[in-house]
């Protein structure tokens, strides 16, 4: 049966009911392991370093954390997106190259919700995979170490061609992408703190400032 949407989420629910045709997506690791799931977000192909995050909440903070630039993030918690997109961002934009989840909630419920993860990923051209065993994937990464991988919707992928590309891939200098381009100052009456921005989250400066510090970024 249909569940009545929370107030203010009518448009979100209408979009989700329309949905889109489910498309297969594949996560190919450089060790030859292949995980098959459903495409979420953008359908473009991407090669990236694969890392995992064990947070039970705060998926939006993870998506907007500059320290994940140049990486595709695996969320180990099984259900992601149940409260939608809220204003709780750690920067002005999302940074991961890809997003990998066990199950993506397409009907969020939260009075602060401004959209869905699916919409957010599509808008920011971030490809992802849902419906795979993220804990099995995390176990591989934990035992073998961080490795490169490819997210693709191409069902005719060729492992013999892809694996050498994955092994040769490097993330490059991501600091240039995430650092601020000009000095910022958060006024305070206490100690003066210099925050070097090599991908600093908004909450670091905010927390220092809330404790009375004048923060120069």
Q: For each of these PLM feature ranges, what is it?
A:
Residues 1-16:
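Single conserved hydrophobic/aromatic residue that forms the stacking wall/gate
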Residues 22-217:
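RNA-binding accessory domains that recognize and position tRNA/RNA substrates
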